[in-house]
C-alpha cells in the first residue's frame, strides 16, 4: 500500500483562522475556517489586535476539528505546514506558534509557506500544473504577476506600486456605505450598472507589467464628494460598474501583455479578488481572443479567500523540495517571493 503524504496546514495571516489536512498536495480531507468578519465590520476594516485575539481563541478548536473531519491523528501526519508571511505580525505569530508546537511535540517536519504561493496553489485543486506558467494574484494586500518557469520557482514580473486591487475595493465600498469586506457587493452592483463615469485606467498603456490603483480610488472619492456637494445622487450601480471596469481593464490588459512576452502553458487567477465574476469573465474572454493556447486555471471560489487548504497544497510542494524550518521560525510580515529566491 502506497503511503499517503498528509500535511496539517495552518493559515492565520490576517482575519481568518484556518486549519486543513491535505493528502498528496491536491486532495482536501478537511478545511476549517473560522471567520472574523462580524468583529471587524464596525471598524470598516481589520483591526490587528482584534484579529490576534480571535486567532488565539480559535486555533486549538480549528485544529481539533480539522483532524476529526479528516479522520486522522497526529501519528498519521507527514509534516506540518504554516504561513509565516506576508501578513499581520500578531496574526501570523499565532499560526506559527501553533505549528511549531505541534511539529515539536510530535517530531514532525515543519514546513514554512509563503502566503502568496499558497494562493497560487489553490488552483492545484482544479488541475495539475504545467510549466512554464503565469499567475495573476489579486487580493486585499497584493496585486502581482508571477512567472513560474518551473515548480517552486517564482519571479515577480509586475506588482502594484501603491494600493492593491482588493484594498481599493474595500475603500471604495466604504465610501458607498457597503460593509467590510466590500468586494462581493461591489461586484454584484457592477453587474447591474454601466461604465458611465469612465474612471482612469492608470498605467494601462505603459510598457511594463506594474499596476496602480491609488489614482482610481482618489478619482472615485472625488466624484462622490463633488456630487454630495451639489446635492446630486449618483446611481450606485453605475458607480460600482465604472470602478470595477477600470480595475478589470487594467488587470486583463497587463496580464495579456505579460503573456505576449512570457510564453506559458497555463495562467492562474488566484487571491481573494479572483472570486470577482467580472474579472473572471473578462480575463477568460481576453485569453480566448489573444492567447487561446493558454489554459486558464481559476482557483475554486471557496479557496479564493484565505484558507489553510491552499497552504497545505503549497506546503506539500515545499516539503518535496526539502524546505524545512526549526523552532527559530518567526513571522515575516513583509515576506516576498524575493525572500524565497534568497533562501533557496
From Swiss-Prot:
EC number: 2.3.1.234
Keywords, ordered alphabetically: Acyltransferase, Cytoplasm, Iron, Metal-binding, Transferase, tRNA processing
GO molecular function, one term: iron ion binding
Main location: cytoplasm
Cofactor(s) needed: Fe(2+)
SUPFAM superfamilies per UniProt: Actin-like ATPase domain (SSF53067)
GO biological-process terms attached to the record: tRNA threonylcarbamoyladenosine modification
Residues reported in the UniProt entry to bind Fe cation: 115, 119, 306
Keyword Transport tagged: no
Enzyme class name: transferase
Iron keyword on record: yes
Pfam families on file: TsaD
Source domain of life: Bacteria
Catalytic activity: L-threonylcarbamoyladenylate + adenosine(37) in tRNA = N(6)-L-threonylcarbamoyladenosine(37) in tRNA + AMP + H(+)
Binding sites annotated in the UniProt record for substrate: 137-141, 170, 183, 187, 276
Family per record: Belongs to the KAE1 / TsaD family.
Function, as annotated: Required for the formation of a threonylcarbamoyl group on adenosine at position 37 (t(6)A37) in tRNAs that read codons beginning with adenine. Is involved in the transfer of the threonylcarbamoyl moiety of threonylcarbamoyl-AMP (TC-AMP) to the N6 group of A37, together with TsaE and TsaB. TsaD likely plays a direct catalytic role in this reaction.
PANTHER family named in the record: TRNA N6-ADENOSINE THREONYLCARBAMOYLTRANSFERASE, TRNA N6-ADENOSINE THREONYLCARBAMOYLTRANSFERASE, MITOCHONDRIAL
This protein's name: tRNA N6-adenosine threonylcarbamoyltransferase
Source organism of this protein record: Limosilactobacillus fermentum (strain NBRC 3956 / LMG 18251) (Lactobacillus fermentum)
Protein's gene: tsaD
Amino acid at each position: 500500500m502506497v503511503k499517503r503524504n498528509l500535511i496539517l496546514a495552518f493559515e492565520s495571516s490576517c482575519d481568518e483562522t484556518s486549519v486543513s489536512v491535505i493528502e498528496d498536495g491536491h486532495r482536501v480531507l478537511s478545511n476549517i475556517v473560522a471567520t472574523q468578519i462580524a468583529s471587524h465590520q464596525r471598524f470598516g476594516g481589520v483591526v490587528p489586535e482584534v484579529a490576534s485575539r480571535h486567532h488565539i481563541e480559535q486555533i486549538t478548536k480549528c485544529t481539533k476539528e480539522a483532524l476529526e473531519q479528516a479522520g486522522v491523528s497526529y501519528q498519521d501526519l507527514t509534516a506540518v505546514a504554516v504561513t509565516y508571511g506576508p501578513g499581520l505580525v500578531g496574526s501570523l505569530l499565532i499560526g506559527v506558534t501553533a505549528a511549531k508546537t505541534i511539529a515539536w511535540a510530535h517530531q514532525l517536519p515543519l514546513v514554512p509557506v509563503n502566503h502568496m504561493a499558497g494562493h497560487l496553489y489553490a488552483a492545484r485543486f482544479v488541475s495539475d500544473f504545467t510549466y512554464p506558467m503565469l499567475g495573476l494574484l489579486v487580493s486585499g494586500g497584493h496585486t502581482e504577476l508571477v512567472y513560474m518557469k518551473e515548480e517552486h520557482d517564482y519571479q515577480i514580473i509586475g506588482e502594484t506600486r501603491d494600493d492593491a486591487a482588493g484594498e481599493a475595493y474595500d475603500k471604495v465600498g466604504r465610501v458607498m456605505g457597503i460593509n467590510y469586506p466590500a468586494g462581493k457587493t461591489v461586484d454584484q452592483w457592477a453587474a447591474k450598472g454601466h461604465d458611465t463615469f469612465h474612471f482612469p485606467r492608470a498605467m494601462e498603456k505603459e510598457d511594463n507589467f506594474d499596476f496602480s490603483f491609488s489614482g482610481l480610488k482618489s478619482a472615485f472619492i472625488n466624484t462622490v464628494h463633488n456630487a454630495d456637494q451639489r446635492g446630486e445622487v449618483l446611481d450606485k450601480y453605475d458607480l460600482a460598474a465604472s470602478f470595477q471596469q477600470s480595475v478589470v481593464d487594467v488587470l486583463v490588459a497587463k496580464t495579456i501583455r505579460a503573456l505576449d512576452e512570457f510564453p506559458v502553458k497555463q495562467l492562474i487567477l488566484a487571491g481573494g479578488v479572483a472570486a470577482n465574476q467580472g474579472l473572471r469573465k473578462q480575463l477568460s474572454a481576453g485569453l480566448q481572443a489573444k492567447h487561446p493556447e493558454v489554459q486558464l486555471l481559476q482557483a475554486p471560489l471557496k479557496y479564493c479567500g484565505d484558507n489553510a487548504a491552499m497552504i497545505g497544497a503549497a506546503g506539500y510542494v515545499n516539503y518535496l523540495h526539502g524546505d524545512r524550518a526549526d523552532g527559530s521560525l518567526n513571522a515575516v510580515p513583509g515576506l516576498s517571493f524575493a525572500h524565497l529566491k534568497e533562501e533557496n
